[in-house]
């Protein structure tokens, strides 16, 4: 089972109204947790693109200071994937301190981009592989994920060839969408070869249930605020 941590609505330090270093504080909790995530998705729907870029820079700078923490960072573009496609690549330039390992598409993105757009994203100047963490492997692939809420979304994600999907909500309502429940999750996940991660109201006590229902792992925003 793999685990995906999704950032809460944190801002980078210079914009935090409460002071302190919210990105560092969040990542420290994740780092000290008894279960290590395989991926962290940087997500904050309240930030514009420039603010999101600054947040990712701070997250990567913080991750580089954390020994033996080989988590991969994925950027949720807040529906601005086309902007990221149009910006790059720029030879020899990476705006992020350590770069990112991939992009997470919103359910809106799924229908606004084409498969060839993903090929352009793979050349993005936002991508940078930390070869010290990846043991010298210079062929580490760009990761693409997607948020899905129904069978139509999953079919489109499969057409684009994404590497994983977050299927939600499972146990709690999300933006007016009623919870799918485990029975529906299993039914939908068995219709695709894409690894599917349940999201929405989950904690570590749901791991065995998720595994029984064909989940590749579990994902959550508050997941790593809980004990395993």
Model region roles, listed by residue range:
Residues 182:
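Short alpha-helical segments enriched in small residues
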Residues 200-201:
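Conserved donor-binding loops in enzymes that form glycosidic bonds
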Residues 175:
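Phosphate/ribose-phosphate-bearing ligand recognition and processing surfaces
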Residues 1-132, 137-164, 193-194, 204-215, ...:
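Conserved N-terminal beta1-alpha1 strand-loop-helix module at the mouth
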């Amino acid at each position: 089972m793999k685990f995906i941590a999704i950032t809460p609505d944190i801002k980078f330090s210079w914009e935090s109204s409460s002071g302190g270093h919210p990105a560092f504080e969040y990542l420290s909790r994740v780092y000290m947790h008894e279960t290590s995530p395989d991926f962290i998705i940087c997500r904050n729907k309240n930030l514009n693109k420039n603010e999101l870029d600054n947040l990712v820079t701070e997250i990567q700078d913080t991750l580089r200071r954390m020994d033996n923490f080989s988590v991969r960072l994925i950027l949720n573009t807040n529906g601005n994937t086309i902007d990221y496609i149009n910006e790059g690549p720029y030879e020899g330039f990476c705006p992020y301190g350590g770069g990112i390992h991939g992009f997470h598409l919103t359910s809106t993105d799924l229908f606004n981009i084409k498969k060839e757009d993903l090929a352009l994203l793979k050349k993005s100047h936002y991508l940078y592989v930390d070869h010290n963490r990846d043991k010298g492997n210079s062929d580490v692939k760009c990761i693409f994920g997607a948020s899905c809420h129904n069978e139509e979304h999953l079919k489109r994600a499969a057409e684009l060839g994404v590497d994983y999907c977050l299927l939600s909500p499972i146990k709690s309502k999300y933006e007016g969408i009623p919870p799918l429940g485990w029975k529906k999750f299993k039914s939908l996940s068995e219709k695709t070869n894409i690894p599917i991660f349940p999201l929405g109201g989950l904690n570590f006590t749901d791991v065995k249930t998720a595994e029984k229902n064909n989940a590749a792992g579990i994902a959550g925003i508050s997941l790593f605020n809980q004990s395993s």
